[in-house]
């Protein structure tokens, strides 16, 4: 699983998501295929049938702390409460994005000051998110919820 994470998110992602020696729970399908990887703080990733991971908020936080802004989309104060609740991110509210983001990449949505708001799937390229004034930039899968719970 570390190899898949390194391939999908870049070098160091596997160790960030699945540190050696940490007790992780792997939930499997009835056929034995891994479905979810869960840590004490919550779901890290789900393993899709396409062989790629979809991030949980806990996994997004781990990646954000380790990968120095890779696979992130930043938004400002105006959209923060909506994104926290799990609402989608629209291009007009994007204030920054990693240049390497492509459509269908898993991304971490952060506030412009740096804390994690949500995780989801990019619908536009980085250039599209920066240039477009309309359209969905990120299809949010899971919002981080109430900031008091962090």
Predicted ranges, named:
Residues 1-49:
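N-terminal intrinsically disordered, low-complexity, charge/repeat-rich segments that act as generic
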Residues 40, 102-105:
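Non-catalytic interaction/Regulatory regions outside core domains
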Residues 35, 106-108:
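Generic short beta-strand
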Residues 28-30, 99-102:
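Solvent-exposed alpha-helices and their adjacent loops that cap or buttress functional pockets
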Residues 51-95, 101-102, 109-150:
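Beta-strand/loop-dominated core regions that host nucleotide or nucleotide-derived cofactor-binding catalytic loops
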């Amino acid at each position: 699983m570390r190899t898949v994470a390194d391939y999908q998110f870049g070098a160091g992602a596997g160790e960030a998501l699945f540190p050696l020696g940490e007790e992780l729970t792997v939930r499997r399908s009835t056929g034995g295929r891994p479905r979810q990887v869960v840590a004490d703080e919550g779901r890290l990733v789900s393993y899709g049938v396409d062989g790629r991971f979809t991030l949980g908020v806990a996994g997004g936080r781990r990646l954000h702390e380790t990968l120095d802004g890779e696979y992130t989309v930043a938004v400002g104060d105006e959209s923060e409460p909506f994104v926290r609740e799990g609402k989608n991110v629209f291009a007009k509210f994007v204030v920054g994005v990693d240049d390497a983001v492509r459509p269908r990449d898993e991304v971490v949505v952060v506030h412009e000051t740096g804390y994690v708001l949500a995780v989801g799937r990019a619908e536009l390229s980085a250039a599209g998110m920066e240039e477009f004034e309309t359209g969905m930039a990120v299809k949010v899968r899971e919002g981080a919820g109430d900031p008091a719970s962090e």
